[in-house]
Structures are given as C-alpha cells and as structure tokens.
Amino acid sequence: MVGRKSYGMDILFKIIEINKKTNTAVLKGLEMRLIADAKLDDLVFPDAKTVQRYRKQSEEAQKECIRKIYRRRSLEREQLRSVSGRAPEEFFEMPGKILHLDGDPEYLEECLKAYQSLQLDVVGEFVPEKEQPVQVWHLLHQHRPDILILTGHDAYIKNEKNDFQSLKYYRNSRYFVEAVQKARKYEPGKDDLVIFAGACQSHYEALLAAGANFASSPQRVMIHALDPVFLVEKVAFTSINESVNIFELIKHTITGLDGVGGLETRGKFRLGLPKSPY
C-alpha cells in the first residue's frame, strides 16, 4: 500500500506492476476507480494509523450512503400506505434487474456485497475494459437486464495541449464508449435499457453522446468504487411511472456532482399486489 508524495498522499494505492528499467510503478486505487503511473521515488509507504484513518473514512462514507437509501425507502413505503390505504406488507416489489460489468475483480466483489445489502437483483461479471465492447452484446442477450453498468478503471492522461476532448488522452474511456455504442445497438431506447458508464476521470461528454444515461466524470475527478451501485439503486427503485430525480440520485453517491451525472430517465421499479403467502 502506497501514496504519492507529489499529490500529498491524497489517495492510497496498491502497486500492481513495477518497471525496473524506467523506475516506475503502475498503481491501482484502494477505493477509487483509478489506474495511475508513478515514479518509484515519489511513492511513500503510509504508517498504520494513516491506513486505518483512510479506511475508516471510506467505510463511514459508504455506510452513510446506505443509511440515506434505507431512510428514503422507508419514507416511500409510508407514502404508499397513506395513498393506497394498504399496509406495505401487502405489496411485493420488483426493482430493475442490473448487469454489472467490471474491469476489476476486487471492486466487483465489493459492489456485489453492496448490491446484496441493498436487496438489488444483479448479475456481476468481471470483464476487462478492453473486452467490454466485445462481450457486452452477448451478455445483454444472456441476462436481459433493465440496467447496465460498464465500469472498471480509467484515468485522464495529462498532455501539453491540455486536451480534455480527445479520447486518446484517456486510459480506458474509448472502450467504455465502444461498449455503450454496442449496447445501444442492442437496445436504442434510453428508458428501456438504462446505462451507466465510466470510472475515474472518464470522458463524461463522450459517454453520454454514445448513449449512456449516466456517466463519469463531469469534472474529471476520481469516483468511488461503489458510486455506480449507489447511483443505479435509485433507478432500480424509482417507479416506471416516474422520472428519476437526478439531484436525489446523485445525492446518494459518495463523489457527488463533480464525479457523476446524467440525463432525465424513467425508473425501473414495479409494484405488485397481492403478495403471495407462499
């Protein structure tokens, strides 16, 4: 576990590759969906207290997002009781089905735990970013989801032109763009298949132009590994008769408006009556 001196140890990383010829390392964010290169002499090993504090802050942010979600759901069920005159226990719920493609198996595992705690219907697949455009069509046919997530790692590559528009200055955005385009050939309707695409510092505008409903990263900032989960939860639990409140949706993420954004989109939640006793 390391941090970068030049960035004030703002993010902690794992070293995933070392190039002894160039004295550089490839780093993966512990909590952020970022892949970065760094000089070996810029790396610092944090002490145990720093690591503990970093992990605690991240865990608290995650727990707060989950608490907000459950408070919102509780309020929505009470509203249902007052409108229908029936107890929420008489209904059954069918949130939208999610297909989550992730370029990192560790992040995927953490996301699946979060989905489970939020009682979401999800299929998770580890698919490297380069392979997502190749595999997305087959996986969509196989699983028939209501919501698709395309994520993993990404990074903006600094350049002399300070060019934020060319996809060549992003590590993986072009693969996410291609995958979104393939998914839109499978299902063109943005309300029929809801798509979130991107990771840290991804090309937000290009992803939306390709057909994503939601994407990262408007301000080219880092996003948390669980941000896609918290974002699509709101879509999965918003009625098919309503548009998702974008401000409410983004409020439930860890990163907020700087990291994720998107378009007005209809929800994927269906309510059923009566609930079977069996």
Task: Pin down the residues of each PLM region.
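Proline-aspartate-enriched helix->loop->beta-strand connector
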Residues: 140-153, 212
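Intrinsically disordered, low-complexity, charged/polar segments
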Residues: 32-80
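Conserved acidic segment of CheY-like receiver
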Residues: 96-105
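Short beta-strand-centered aromatic/proline hotspots
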Residues: 9-19
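Short helix-loop-beta junction
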Residues: 112-123
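SH3/SH3-like beta-barrel fold
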Residues: 15, 24-34, 38
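C-terminal functional extensions of proteins
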Residues: 219-278
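Catalytic cores of nucleophile-dependent amide-cleaving enzymes
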Residues: 176-223
